[in-house]
């Protein structure tokens, strides 16, 4: 809002000045008052994306994460923070965490496995799937290959079944109360180190949200 919106770049120009334009475009100044206190987040799990987010944004949504494996992110995030002269205290790592409370752990894991199989197996071409690469970086290389093979072959149920229990348990909160409470300790420890800022909890059960809130707040 400090001036008119003008830009001359390699791909884009404001106002548009192409040969097929009318030539009537004028740079405008916004009449709206921007709220600069609203934080800016990006969604990323790639090295370049994480570094860029740490440098330019206020936080990142890394889809899901294992709070014990900040080492997967650390080099990229540190690179971006250093470039911007920031620290982890200036940056929010906010993963999506699904919480499903129940005594049947396999039943609780099932919908999460289906979702993770979609990302690890089907989000992108065989040789260019960032989520598949991410699962490998977390230590599940063989499983990631198997999930992708099954998913791209149209065997979605088998792909979901191939998602390791350990991967679900590491990145989400599933099962009986005692199991969830125990796993929350790792998230607390990661929060104390600045490795996690906000947990974006997804839960269809009020009691699941209440459990997480009672332990974390």
Predicted feature descriptions by range:
Residues 88-95, 126:
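A generic structural motif
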């Amino acid at each position: 809002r400090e001036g008119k919106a003008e830009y001359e770049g390699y791909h884009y120009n404001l106002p548009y000045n192409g040969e097929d334009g009318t030539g009537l475009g004028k740079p405008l100044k916004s009449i709206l008052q921007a709220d600069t206190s609203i934080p800016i987040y990006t969604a990323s799990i790639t090295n370049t994306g994480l570094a860029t987010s740490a440098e330019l944004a206020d936080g990142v949504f890394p889809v899901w994460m294992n709070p014990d494996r900040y080492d997967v992110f650390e080099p990229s995030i540190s690179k971006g923070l250093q470039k911007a002269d920031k620290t982890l205290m200036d940056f929010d790592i906010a993963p999506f965490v699904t919480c499903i409370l129940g005594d049947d752990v396999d039943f609780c894991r099932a919908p999460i496995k289906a979702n993770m199989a979609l990302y690890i197996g089907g989000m992108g071409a065989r040789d260019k799937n960032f989520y598949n690469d991410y699962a490998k970086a977390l230590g599940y290389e063989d499983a990631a290959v198997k999930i992708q093979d099954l998913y791209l072959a149209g065997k979605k149920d088998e792909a979901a079944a191939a998602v390791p229990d350990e991967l679900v348990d590491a990145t989400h909160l599933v099962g009986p109360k005692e199991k969830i409470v125990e796993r929350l300790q790792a998230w607390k420890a990661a929060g104390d180190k600045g490795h996690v800022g906000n947990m974006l909890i997804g839960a269809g059960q009020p009691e699941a949200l209440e459990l997480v809130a009672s332990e974390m707040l």
